[in-house]
Amino acid sequence: KSTSCMEAGSYCGSTTRICCGYCAYSASKNVCDYPSN
C-alpha cells in the first residue's frame, strides 16, 4: 500500500498526516524531521 507522509519542515500534530521521519516537538511549533544517524 502507498502511504502519504509529510516531508521534513512540515507542521505536524494530531490532525495532520504522519511524518516521513518523526514529529519533532518544540516550544514554539511541531515540525516533521528526519532521524540523525
Swiss-Prot record:
<dbReference type="GO" id="GO:0005576">
    <property type="term" value="C:extracellular region"/>
</dbReference>
<keyword id="KW-0108">Calcium channel impairing toxin</keyword>
<keyword id="KW-0872">Ion channel impairing toxin</keyword>
<feature type="disulfide bond">
    <location>
        <begin position="5"/>
        <end position="20"/>
    </location>
</feature>
<keyword id="KW-1015">Disulfide bond</keyword>
<feature type="propeptide">
    <location>
        <begin position="1"/>
        <end position="4"/>
    </location>
</feature>
<keyword id="KW-0960">Knottin</keyword>
<keyword id="KW-1218">Voltage-gated calcium channel impairing toxin</keyword>
<protein>
    <recommendedName>
        <fullName>Omega-conotoxin-like S6.7</fullName>
    </recommendedName>
</protein>
<comment type="similarity">
    <text>Belongs to the conotoxin O1 superfamily.</text>
</comment>
<keyword id="KW-0638">Presynaptic neurotoxin</keyword>
<keyword id="KW-0528">Neurotoxin</keyword>
<keyword id="KW-0964">Secreted</keyword>
<dbReference type="GO" id="GO:0090729">
    <property type="term" value="F:toxin activity"/>
</dbReference>
<comment type="function">
    <text>Omega-conotoxins act at presynaptic membranes, they bind and block voltage-gated calcium channels (Cav). This toxin blocks N-, P- and Q-type calcium channels.</text>
</comment>
<keyword id="KW-0027">Amidation</keyword>
<keyword id="KW-0800">Toxin</keyword>
<feature type="disulfide bond">
    <location>
        <begin position="19"/>
        <end position="32"/>
    </location>
</feature>
<feature type="disulfide bond">
    <location>
        <begin position="12"/>
        <end position="23"/>
    </location>
</feature>
<dbReference type="GO" id="GO:0005246">
    <property type="term" value="F:calcium channel regulator activity"/>
</dbReference>
<dbReference type="GO" id="GO:0044231">
    <property type="term" value="C:host cell presynaptic membrane"/>
</dbReference>
